[in-house]
Amino acid sequence: MYKRVAARPDWLKAKTVLDVYSLSHCISDDFADYINYWKHNGYWLFNSPEVIEEIATNEGIDLSESTLFYYEVYEYEFDENSNGWSAFKPEPSFVTNVQMPMDKQLEGFDVTTFCAHTSPECSPLSCNSLATTIPVNKHCLFNSFEEAKQAIDGGLFRNSEPGPYRIFATYTVKNGLTNHSTGPARIAAHAG
């Protein structure tokens, strides 16, 4: 996903945060309102940067001020109503053939809501200012998967945004892609 990364807004009082790398588009905008192009995959993101670049070229969208992100999603989502984790899969009516970047840098882990079970919605660390009371890194992300999961299991996301909550490894991409990959064993590949 190409995103226009925003600096920490003044209302977000988490002083350790410099900018917001969240998956949601509430603070750092996506390159476009991309759902309308119907080129996304079953995770409601993209299989490769080339798909996004084609949309941008066809629609006259400037990507020069955008950062390219790649995401890997934990294969379970947390439902606060049942207070438990359950498996989820990509939407089968969309082709999901994620291309893994050759040169990616892990920036941290985001927790994002999927109330409609389609596209990413809110990232409560930034959208609901949870980062003011939960330790995060300079990009408003958890440093580890374990920190993200423990925060959810510990109820720190209660009363923020309606879930379910999904955990995403968030990477910046430098250049290039490899062949199709399913990612690490514990996290399913999920291109941005």
Kindly give the residue locations of the regions a language model identified:
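Short, mixed-charge low-complexity intrinsically disordered segments
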Residues: 38-93, 139-141, 149-192
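Short aromatic-glycine-(Arg/Gly/Cys) micro-motifs in beta-strand/loop hairpins
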Residues: 1-40, 70, 94-137, 162-171
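C2H2-type zinc-finger recognition helix
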Residues: 145
